[in-house]
Amino acid sequence: MSRFFSSNYEYDVASSSSEEDLLSSSEEDLLSSSSSESELDQESDDSFFNESESESEADVDSDDSDAKPYGPDWFKKSEFRKQGGGSNKFLKSSNYDSSDEESDEEDGKKVVKSAKEKLLDEMQDVYNKISQAENSDDWLTISNEFDLISRLLVRAQQQNWGTPNIFIKVVAQVEDAVNNTQQADLKNKAVARAYNTTKQRVKKVSRENEDSMAKFRNDPESFDKEPTADLDISANGFTISSSQGNDQAVQEDFFTRLQTIIDSRGKKTVNQQSLISTLEELLTVAEKPYEFIMAYLTLIPSRFDASANLSYQPIDQWKSSFNDISKLLSILDQTIDTYQVNEFADPIDFIEDEPKEDSDGVKRILGSIFSFVERLDDEFMKSLLNIDPHSSDYLIRLRDEQSIYNLILRTQLYFEATLKDEHDLERALTRPFVKRLDHIYYKSENLIKIMETAAWNIIPAQYKSKFTSKDQLDSADYVDNLIDGLSTILSKQNNIAVQKRAILYNIYYTALNKDFQTAKDMLLTSQVQTNINQFDSSLQILFNRVVVQLGLSAFKLCLIEECHQILNDLLSSSHLREILGQQSLHRISLNSSNNASADERARQCLPYHQHINLDLIDVVFLTCSLLIEIPRMTAFYSGIKVKRIPYSPKSIRRSLEHYDKLSFQGPPETLRDYVLFAAKSMQKGNWRDSVKYLREIKSWALLPNMETVLNSLTERVQVESLKTYFFSFKRFYSSFSVAKLAELFDLPENKVVEVLQSVIAELEIPAKLNDEKTIFVVEKGDEITKLEEAMVKLNKEYKIAKERLNPPSNRR
């Protein structure tokens, strides 16, 4: 029975000798390793057991040298057995021989390399690829590979491994290739662009490593052979100069990482959030104002890039962008005598090199601060377009408009303080002025005063404006002077679109807050309506809004004819909501073509708080149509020759024609119904019911001077009802008592006389006032009475029916 199943079996060392032949020779070769204590020169493969750890095996006869390993781990290799004579080579004891590992490598086993060695191998691969690309002038490959090795260098420096010698060789290699290539020989645009990019980068990198490059140029062969042990942390192939100060190293690392981020912007494979996190970390280690400024100039656009594919920037990210812009402006305020950022500064080749001081001792940095403010404002408007306007979120979001306006004013004052050239100042202030007007032109005078006061309260005391002075803030004419001053400055610009926009802003504000006649004269004298259809959609929408506001301004003064004339052409359109920019962004996205970008669609609509109430527009136009067309319709049907006026499909005449055809006529429900019932009452001469129906319209509450308007409207309804009554009943009466008419329509007698005399003279009605001016005598004319009209109509129908029932005999 096998010894493994025998309960009293005692293992004998000698018994294993007979089982040695079970080991194959191939397995013995793989496990062969000589022991330090083995001195026997034998051809057998007993080296599997000849480790010198126990003395018990020394007593074994030479006959037992062929014995099979025994014990609970007999099947393991000698290196892993506890009693097999071999110690574990993974637990490197004092008697471990590295020849085992070397033999494994010779047998083709995988070698584990350190991260440092892998990095060097990757750089060597880049060197080889660039060498191959040089032969074919493949500058696209050279540019990509040089960009790759630059990123590898950043990895090496992050691990404190220094600059590899192979990197210096690659820089020298690319520099020689650039010098040996003429740009004129590169016909392909993409290749030429890659060549220029590589040329700029290698120039910068070579300048950063001047000492190492000079060392390599002097003796390239011995460059790799020199020891690189300047510091303990350096390794083969890496050099770190210990003579450089820590501050300089930190500064170089700051701008190196910043340049890497700048180069990575715009690439599809780059994670924007990781770039933002890296920039935020750089801000924590920045020390000098120049470092803060350059970091913020990179961080702010990176935040906007992160949300470029979204409908609008998330509110938390928007607030982060707002805080970054505010911090940047605070730094610029504190260092205004040392550093200034504007769009007219000279560009610099390397970001780590601060610009040179000008004659005033100021270092001017190239950048566009107001571009950040504009983008922030655009994202704010997009968010308003995407948020439900009837929700509380919209009102909460709208509170941030004051913060935006503060930044606009702050940027304007910074430009005035830093730009000395008048031409540059005018160019720079154009966009801030347009944005300021864009935020205030549609508001009332009181709201604008509140916004201006809040904005000036956060402005540093060092800033003053010669265009919009704070000293006049308490003046009653401050807002009027502000709007007029900004518009006047913009109207002098060479850009025609800016000129028209500024004039329209001023006209809208004037029509809303001041008086109609001034706004009308401004519109006519400016001729802003000329070629308005050739400009972009946003300017056309603004023009339409100005026209509507001009009509509403005329209605507030009870200038009914002027209001009707202004609104008639505009309301004849079936797309009033679209031409006023008051449709939803979602609807525009569905109806617009695929080629229209999100910004183009956003320019075609306005936020909800800027809308003009469409119900108010309809009510105003219908009321004007009521007061103009009802008397004329009555005169026409009475046989009086009147001048026909153009009317739109939305006029009261169309509504009355449709109403008379209805089989069921219920009480008024909609706004149009109330105006319609007011018209029916006016046709009967019942002015009190007409006024009653008009006053029940709730849209009048949107007018700032509602009671004044309604009182003026009531007086006008009385006058037009008097005219309608006179036209309707002059065929039935031979005379009209002035006192009776004054009592009936609640008007003074002199007013009744004035109205009827003007109507008689205008329409040439055969009637006159007696000498006592108490009675209007009506002369009988060619017109027929209602009874005679019915008789003529009945006679005509009788003849038609007779011919139909009794046809002539000669007709078939």
Curated annotation (Swiss-Prot):
It is found in: Cytoplasm. The modification Phosphoserine is found at S98, S99, S103. Residues 608-783 form the PCI domain. Residues 18-30, 38-64 have a biased composition (Acidic residues). GO terms for molecular function: RNA binding; translation initiation factor activity; translation initiation factor binding. Residues 1-110 are annotated as: Disordered. GO terms for biological process: formation of cytoplasmic translation initiation complex. The keyword Phosphoprotein applies. Keywords: Cytoplasm, Initiation factor, Phosphoprotein, Protein biosynthesis. GO terms for cellular component: eukaryotic 43S preinitiation complex; eukaryotic 48S preinitiation complex; eukaryotic translation initiation factor 3 complex. Belongs to the eIF-3 subunit C family. Component of the eukaryotic translation initiation factor 3 (eIF-3) complex. HAMAP family: eIF3c. Component of the eukaryotic translation initiation factor 3 (eIF-3) complex, which is involved in protein synthesis of a specialized repertoire of mRNAs and, together with other initiation factors, stimulates binding of mRNA and methionyl-tRNAi to the 40S ribosome. The eIF-3 complex specifically targets and initiates translation of a subset of mRNAs involved in cell proliferation. This is Eukaryotic translation initiation factor 3 subunit C. It comes from Saccharomyces cerevisiae (strain YJM789). The gene is NIP1.
